[in-house]
């Protein structure tokens, strides 16, 4: 197919013509060997675009999702995915800063002319492919978006590895937003997670574009197919009907071990497609003109994607990456007791805790801690029924995890245990909402991933399925399956799927509505939570497998002299600063022997889920917390200026913000006064210092 014809039309088409144009030899553009078939989509910036899928700022902000047909097309699913992923990562309310401090702020036409303000639509070209050379059966989806106003004379690439377990559009509203607006190519990776859902009932799977197909017919085109023979699938369903296998949990691949390389592969993909378009054409082939030495490459993203960016910089032996700018990174460090973190009178020794350790600890104690009087009035407390929380407290007391005789006393004991384990006191108001919406699915998904358990093993008697009103597993509704690419986040509960407690008294039930065999009570499945915890604290082959997989994902904090900025909210209850960014700064100072160029910015009144700030069902987020996304964008601005204009980086510091006034659920609109900038010369009392592994953070 003529590549120019593909570029001229606004629908997906194979890029086989481009792939064939590279000639062997030094200096000629060649398709990387790890790439599968490349599919290309060009968008005009009017009916469709790279950043908002044609929805514009108003469409992203609307509470009404875009309509899809009964058999949704790839274009419809892409639009739905961009809509939901954008809204899942940032606060899209005007009062929260969307459309003023961040969001689709500019208009860029197909000729590259920029005007502001606008609806934020950005014309350009999108390239999509599987990375297929991982040594196992799993796949990573990669994508490159090249805006029409990309300047080949001043090329730049920003990475957008997905956060959480999200699919390929998971970073569209974070580093994707900044990079596209800046005119950079954005290199995305789903890092082997995403909405790979294998419906075992119908034996259907998702494809790279989100449409679904029969697993046998899809073959290697499947995003994820469970490792079961036909006989094994049939036998499993006979005992456990209507179950669904999910890629991150059930691929048996420990995908996190590859997240750094996945990010680097996305950058390599970006260099390839940029040179296909902008390289110098000769009779022998296309000569590469956009190269690492003349291209600004910033590794970026947030949460899991931020950790992937840091890992990529550590693993980058080709000098592809020039700098790093990340937010709230989920990063796990190799043990080193030479690291110390001091905040006021609090001193913590060592490099924090692994994700599975602290998440399974939270999974046990958080539903009891919500009964602490100190957590009263927290956003989301209505989602944690007090009677069930009291039952969890009773079970924990029986197992001697906590003390106390009343629910309030036991809640205090559980909250004290969380703070003693490493959570900041500022995260207390987040306990209820995080348990309600985040912690249990993360604990379960990573138990499966680190233990390399298949769907048929039902680790700790858990599985995934759709349910009826009573919580009983039912067939996954066809409409939910068909739109799962656009609505899911890669980690059930999502896309109509729920977590099932297969050991519930009376038969399998939705986890939150199940009855624990050991207590005979509704207590948020304490038996399952204890089992997940035992995979970290206990012995046996499964626990050893989990520990070995965690060892595989731990990093050294050796950034090889690259400049880097980490921004993190002090109140983060999902990826606490004491387990991640603070000790990373200390370990980096040891790894780079005092020659580090890493800066760490901690932000008061900021936490992990900016999208919760504007969520109507979580009143109180808006009057307590400011958007960390403001500082993530600032970090990218500062890094870009440092790399292009040699402006100095600011010192590590604490930024003291001011929450919005008003009543919970009706906060006044945010202004710049609520979110003061990162300072080039912060007050002495706000400096964060690091020396020989010791990090000192202002109180």
Swiss-Prot record:
Pathway: Lipid metabolism; butanoate metabolism
Gene Ontology cellular component annotations, sorted alphabetically: extracellular space
Signal peptide residue numbers: 1-19
Alphabetically ordered keywords of this record: Hydrolase, Secreted, Signal
Predominant place of localization: secreted
InterPro entries: AB_hydrolase_fold (IPR029058), OHBut_olig_hydro_put (IPR016582)
Catalytic activity line of the entry: (3R)-hydroxybutanoate dimer + H2O = 2 (R)-3-hydroxybutanoate + H(+)
An annotated GO BP: butyrate metabolic process
UniProt superkingdom: Bacteria
UniProt keyword Lipid metabolism, yes or no: no
Keyword Secreted: yes
E.C. numbers: 3.1.1.22
Cellular localisation: Secreted
EC class of the enzyme, as a word: hydrolase
GO-annotated molecular function: hydroxybutyrate-dimer hydrolase activity
Active site: 303 (charge relay system)
Protein name: D-(-)-3-hydroxybutyrate oligomer hydrolase
